[in-house]
């Protein structure tokens, strides 16, 4: 299923090949410091802040890209998402996608 999703994303230009190659989980953990100030690594939701643990990598990347392009409304997330390069988004997606809710 993931393979089909990625092929469709490539076809429509939603995800670059660099992102789909998969990220470095250790690098993602290193980069996650700012994320976990609001999004708990335990997978619990806090108020209106969504849990991001266990998200599919392609969904995580697509959502972060839409924040960076200001297609989704949240000034904090727009600012945070715009900071990351493709390899960093892939690493974050791999890290959070690989965590299991506690």
Please state what every model-predicted region is.
Residues 46-53, 68-100:
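Axial heme c-ligation environment in periplasmic c-type cytochrome domains
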Residues 27-30, 59-62, 76-79, 91:
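Extracytoplasmic/secreted proteins, especially bacterial periplasmic and envelope-associated proteins
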Residues 7-8, 18:
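Cleavable N-terminal signal peptides
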Residues 37-40, 62, 69, 79:
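Regular, well-ordered alpha-helical segments
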Residues 14-32, 48-50, 61, 66, ...:
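Electrostatic cytochrome c docking/interface patches
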Residues 33-42, 92:
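The canonical Cys-X-X-Cys-His
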Residues 1-4:
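Positively charged n-region of N-terminal signal peptides that target proteins for export
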